[in-house]
UniProtKB/Swiss-Prot annotation:
This is Small ribosomal subunit protein uS14. Keywords: Ribonucleoprotein, Ribosomal protein, RNA-binding, rRNA-binding. GO terms for molecular function: rRNA binding; structural constituent of ribosome. Belongs to the universal ribosomal protein uS14 family. It comes from Alkalilimnicola ehrlichii (strain ATCC BAA-1101 / DSM 17681 / MLHE-1). Disulfide bonds: none annotated.
Amino acid sequence: MAKVSMVERERKRQKTVRRFAAKREALKAIINSVDATQQERFEAQLKLQKLPRDSSPVRGRNRCRVTGRPRGYYRKFGLGRNKLREAAMNGEIPGLVKSSW
């Protein structure tokens, strides 16, 4: 199990990302716009830099929903490799069968 503080920190990051998503998107649209003047782009870039670092989605880390483990994460299932294996062996994931050849 991952430390509770790390899992909570990640939840807080996700919350911050959601809170600032619209603002970040608007500023990025101005920065990438060909119609905006150089001054407008520069000001938008400064505003984007003033936003909290944790509002950037790339700072997030995928974690297992059950254990909070950050490594060995399978996006399709939202589980770490250990819990994915357990769930597969118990038949809890429909359509997933152990490979055999």
